Amino acid sequence: MIQSQTYLNVADNSGARKLMCIRVLGAGNRNTANIGDIIIAIIKEAAPNMPLEESEVVRAVVIRTCKELKRSDGMIIRSDDNAAVVIDQKGNPRGTRVFGSVTEELRELNFTKIISLAPEVL
């Protein structure tokens, strides 16, 4: 579960390396984000000579969490890190590659571009 002040790794080649969540979008009274939720984040670490810089406010989609995700068939999916993909206002990824695995739940939320870029779908 991702909440405000949580640090996340960036799982794409957009230039950002670490994000800090400052807001969960569309949460209402819920203050936490799970896989597939959109967050507002600040870039805390960035690669040099890339379009995204530190202290820039961006939108991102959470693709992996340390908190387990329970599916209806009984399968439990858990990751070693919290990771996100930086997106633009239309929901398309800013990078051209996605590193690591993503879950099938992103397909239901219409993030098919992220799924097509990922090397592994769980």
Curated annotation (Swiss-Prot):
GO BP annotation list: translation
Gene Ontology CC annotations of this record: chloroplast; cytosolic large ribosomal subunit
tRNA processing listed as a keyword: no
SMART domains attached to this UniProt entry: Ribosomal_L14
Domain of life: Eukaryota
Keyword set, alphabetical order: Chloroplast, Plastid, Ribonucleoprotein, Ribosomal protein, RNA-binding, rRNA-binding
InterPro entries: Ribosomal_uL14, Ribosomal_uL14_bac-type, Ribosomal_uL14_sf
A Pfam family it matches: Ribosomal_L14
Transmembrane segments: none
Subcellular localization, as worded in the UniProt entry: Plastid, Chloroplast
GO MF assignments: large ribosomal subunit rRNA binding; structural constituent of ribosome
Record family assignment: Belongs to the universal ribosomal protein uL14 family.
Free-text function comment from the UniProt entry: Binds to 23S rRNA.
Assembly information from the UniProt record: Part of the 50S ribosomal subunit.
NCBIfam families in UniProt: rplN_bact (TIGR01067)
Name listed for the protein in its UniProt record: Large ribosomal subunit protein uL14c
Classification lineage: Eukaryota, Viridiplantae, Streptophyta, Embryophyta, Tracheophyta
Gene: rpl14
